Regions:
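Conserved catalytic submotifs in the C-terminal HATPase_c
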Residues: 73, 80-84, 104-118
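Conserved glycine-rich
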Residues: 210-211
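Short alpha-helical segment of the dimerization/phosphotransfer core of two-component systems
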Residues: 54-59
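Short helix-loop "hinge" at the ATP-lid/N-box region of the Bergerat-fold HATPase_c
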Residues: 138-139
């Protein structure tokens, strides 16, 4: 038990340090955009600045996942609860989702949003993170068809669903889905291979809100990931 706690603490501190360092590098790269002599490189595909920017993005994302996971296992993750307008939150989520889909020309992003959703008490940043993690996961495993964000009002909850027409998940792999550092991919060189932390973080965020999370999936048909936030 003590070794596990020590490892979790190390993971949290390591990811925090890496995240800070990468953020400083990102700030320096952003500063280059304001240097007049470098204007010819801005927005040019494969230019040094754009290459660095593109390389930094997934690294920062992975390190952020590590830090968030470290917060879950060391009980550091807390919520800053406030009144949340789901429609306003969704506007920002869908803007980012559109950017995630820029390289997926065969995939259409759809919305199915209930009318007259009430204001809820939640952590808007964590709620946004949970929804974006599900969308990012759908984008990663969907090459054609649709990704649908569905939100509906239930008697005691708001139900969030991200549905895709991706590769789906075999039944024997269902138990791995919310486990950290697990993958459903057999090919260890698959570019979609990550650390398996995104869905675990979603589960923890939802748990902190006293909600529930689950999924349904069929190979070759697609997947639907759900979570609820109490009213």
């Amino acid at each position: 038990m003590e070794n596990t706690e020590t490892s979790d603490e190390f993971l949290y501190k390591m990811s925090s340090t890496l995240r800070k360092g990468l953020a400083e590098v990102q700030a320096k790269v952003n500063a280059l955009y304001r240097v007049e002599e470098l204007e010819e490189y801005i927005g040019v595909k494969d230019s040094p600045i754009e290459y660095i920017q593109a390389a930094l993005a997934p690294l920062i994302g992975q390190v952020s996942d590590f830090q968030d996971y470290g917060e879950t296992v060391t009980s550091r993750m807390t919520l800053n609860l406030e009144e949340v307008d789901v429609y306003a939150m969704l506007d920002s989520v869908m803007t980012i989702a559109d950017q995630l889909l820029e390289q997926k020309s065969g995939v259409t992003l759809e919305e199915e949003i209930a009318e007259e959703l009430p204001i809820i008490e939640a952590d808007p940043l964590r709620l946004t993170q949970a929804l974006l993690n599900l969308i990012h996961n759908a984008v990663k495993f969907t090459d054609k068809g649709f990704i649908t964000v569905h939100i509906e009002l239930e008697p005691e909850n708001i139900l969030f669903e991200v549905r895709d027409t991706g590769i789906g998940i075999a039944e024997e792999n269902h138990e791995l889905v919310f486990q950290p550092f697990q993958t459903i991919l057999a090919d260890k060189d698959d570019p979609r291979l990550g650390f398996g932390l995104g869905l675990k973080i979603v589960e923890h965020i939802v748990d902190l809100h006293d909600g529930e999370s689950w999924f349904e999936s069929e190979p070759g048909v697609g997947s639907s990931f759900f979570f609820t936030i109490p009213l």
